[in-house]
Amino acid sequence: MRAALLAVLLAVAGPTGALCADEFEAQAALFRYDPAADLKVEEAGVEKQGTVSVHDIRFTPVPGAEPVKAYIVVPEGKGPFAGVLWVHWLGEPATTNRTQFLKEAVDLAPKGMVSLLVEGMWSAPDWYGKRVPEQDYDHSIRQVVALRRAMDLLLSRPDVDKARVGYVGHDYGGMYGMMANGVDRRARTYVYIAVVPSLNDWAFFARQPVSKAAYLRQNAPLELTDYLRQVKNASTLFQFANKDVYVSRADTQVVMGAASTPKERRFYEADHGMAVPQAAADRDAWLLKELGLGGPGLPPLPSPSPR
């Protein structure tokens, strides 16, 4: 499968693997939308957690789309605050939704951070098993647009400093984020957790397309590294697990190589769920430093043991 994918990529991107400006702009046009369209934000309720307010909301990315469930986590005060868009993984049902990073967002709020936590299309029950591969292309484009609209919503808040915005995504939340951020480029820092270089790497675990060759051709404009390469003047933290059966060490090298500097790659004694305290502590420290909220940033890696 990877050999076939490589052939497609070379045909589309040329020998260097990097798209020229005109080629990328043609791809970016797939994700255009009307920024003036009403997001139709509706609030279902608000919960106070200490001094932090957690707003339960829905918004409509584009006219006719299904509303997206989200939380907005807001600290006490007028701001301006840093802002972060968080997007969950596809994994355990309990956390395959907007709650995955909620505790982190609440803990970070008093330090000066507004968070928007949204649900992706993969939050639907048995989303992966029910997918129709021939619909992946259209659904992927809609998902990227929905993430761009989520960024619109976050930045529309008068208490959010547009110059201090970040993005955190795990698994599909990171991979669709790579596309959205490569087109959007409004964030100052990114954290991508347990991601691979191509959506195609995870496309064939269940239902198979009628024609794999046709599937690869259709989805070639969605190659994640094309979008990673577009982001300049921003920092990126990649977090990976040493026991991840879905992400190889070679995968981590590919995405790390596609990102611009400054960038950092960290590994943890975890599986794909990345549910270890050090991973959360590191990304929170990264966000605080990169978004101007203080703190020393990532702790240094331990020195190798002497032989």
Model-derived features: positions:
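Cap/lid segment of the alpha/beta-hydrolase catalytic domain
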Residues: 87-145, 199-206
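C-terminal catalytic histidine-bearing segment of alpha/beta-hydrolase fold enzymes
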Residues: 258-307
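Acidic beta-to-alpha connecting loop that harbors the catalytic carboxylate
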Residues: 242-244, 270-271
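Primarily recognizes the serine-hydrolase "nucleophile elbow" in alpha/beta-hydrolase
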Residues: 148-213
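Conserved alpha/beta-hydrolase "acid-adjacent" motif
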Residues: 245-251, 275
